[in-house]
Amino acid sequence: ETAAREGVFDPLFATTDKFNFEVVTLYTSGARHIYTNKPITKPEDLKGYKIRVQDSDTYIQMINLMGGVGIAMGQSEVYAAVQQHVIEGGENSEVVYNNFKHYEIAPYFSYTNHLVMTDVVVANKDFLDDMDEDTRATFRKLMKESMEVEFAAWDQNIEDAKAVLDEHGVTFVKADIEAFRERCMPLLESIANRSDMTREVYDKVQEIKAREA
């Protein structure tokens, strides 16, 4: 959140002009964590565990590095797949975990914090160019301000979901986040080194993380 507020991603977003759209703000969809039929506190706990991920080679590689086996699967298939022992669990935020009632088949929610998700809000450049200068400036200002509103709303969504999950007897587990991060460093470094710009953005995010630790 701090990185978004401080404009760390702005140089990256400026590259979208050539594609005729502009990034007008960033929203959050929270951090993602592992949920299964047992506590997951360290990479060794995931050994042999098949974890549902989105259909992405990067996501599959991430779970594999974390110690498990990444399985690409549609979200709507997860409940039955866990019930039938096709997979052992999934990874997502408390909100999605609650909405799909996955606590019924995977009652241990382990805070691995392996991904922090952002939603990028974009506007077509033609749409923006059709506005007069004052209207365009107001639009951009309000979109930036809406980020704080969305962040606060998401935090409330998390608290509301956790309250429901508590009622259903979910066990929240503290995981060794650093141990999982160490396992994923080869992937992180490969993504960071895709260009000078991504390297700079990654390093600035790490500086903020160290500052807030």
Task: Please identify what each model-predicted range represents.
Residues 9-10, 14-213:
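N-terminal secretory/targeting leader peptides
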Residues 1-7:
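Extracytoplasmic "Venus flytrap"/periplasmic binding protein-like
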